[in-house]
Amino acid sequence: FLTMNIKIIASVGVVLLCSLNGYAQVLHLDNALQRSAENYDRIKSKKSIVSAFEQNTVFQKQQYLPDVTLAAQQSFGTINMVHGSMYAYGGLASASTSLPLAEQNWNAAFGSLYFANVNWNLFTFGRIKNEVKLGQSKEKTAIADLEQEIFQLQVKTSAAYLNLLASQRLQFVQEKNLERAQVFFEMTDSRAKSGLIPEVDASLAKAEVSNAKSLQIKSYDKVLEYSKQLAVFLGEEFQTYQLDSLYSTTIPKNILSPENSDVSKHPLLQLQQSKVDQSLQSESLVKTQRLPNLSAFGVLQGRGSGFESNYMQDNSAYSGSYLKGVGIDRGNYLLGFTLSWNITNLYRFNSKVKEQQYFTQSLKQDYDLLHKELNAQSKLAQSQLANAYENFEETKVQLSAAQLAYRQHTALYENGLTTLVDYTQALYALNRAEIDYEIAQNNVWQALLLLASSQGDLEILTQKH
């Protein structure tokens, strides 16, 4: 039994030690924001998209390189030909070459074709250049999308952080309320047993203890709920967190001023502007489709055949040997330039240019709308922050008065100078005042978060106040 008890004590000690270690490390808000940006799967997905667009930009730059084609073909067949015309619809005609013979025969031999082909777009009148720029614009848009996704995640993480902090503070308030209720019950129960007060007072005091315990349990449920939310945003397993007391013991300094209403650098606006720039670049690319293309080409070719050069005079002058037909008997080269211009594109692509211009116009209008909404949201946040400051000052007055009233009613009840109803009302008032105080203090930070999110700058929230 002694050994078993030692094992139990050791196990409990390990659990307590792990719990203490878990609570010993304070999770600061700036650290939480960093961890969310690194671990959240949605952010990882956006980073992969950015990498994909980076590779697309590299591919577009590689379009400056020439097309170089190497090919080797070996075949076996006849070379019967006749005079006449034909059109090879949907593909190439037969590659057999010969003069027409007097009659059909089925002589067959091996043949071969080897060639190297180079085609280089020397001058595309800006088409490839604009394709590269469009690829770079898409990459910038993907980066802007990643940044706004990180910003939105960090706003949600900050809200979850503050909500968890508020729930922890409310749990602490309910624990203090439970302690007061238990002290009150012990005092009432002892006096009731002594016959100084009716037994019903002790029963009511016991009910108050149960009610306080219920409120404490419900407050802990909220702590667990917001802990889960924060853990999800951090990309971690469910756990409890010890948060920075800065956001529960102080309020931010008053930063309201006209200079703090700039929203031009908001990540959402930056993303929308990058979409506008991408659309403008698409306009430039579409315009180049109306222009000609100048290219250089070169071909080096070698051919072999099992048919001899005098086959037309002597139909037996051929060999069915594979090695005879796959060698190179003749070679040719070809060099030149090609200037191609589909002149109907001058008319055809006018509609495509106008189409893209309308897309650009739509994106600009969306940008203007978003800018107005963020400006309005910023002004609203400033007003709400000012109200939060004022409300917090009022809750301090409320809490001070409730604490004084509770102490007075406690003294009066202990001396039999007030009723149980008056005392419990003072107890309720103090609990409500403590809750209002904690909520009002947290609301100041929540209002500051709203201001930071509307202006696109979370440093307003994370800087030391």
Locate each region found by the language model.
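N-terminal signal peptide c-region/cleavage motif recognized by signal peptidases
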Residues: 19-21
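Short segments within alpha-helical structural elements
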Residues: 52, 214-236, 399-457
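Bacterial Sec-pathway N-terminal export signals of envelope proteins
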Residues: 24-80, 122, 237-238, 243-282, ...
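Sec/SRP-type N-terminal targeting helices
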Residues: 44-48, 61, 106-108, 122-150, ...
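Periplasmic alpha-helical coiled-coil/stalk elements that build and connect Gram-negative outer-membrane
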Residues: 152-267, 430, 437
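Small/polar, glycine/serine/threonine/aspartate-rich low-complexity segments that form flexible
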Residues: 71-117, 247-251, 297-341, 465
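Acidic, low-complexity, intrinsically disordered peripheral segments
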Residues: 2-3, 9, 69, 78, ...
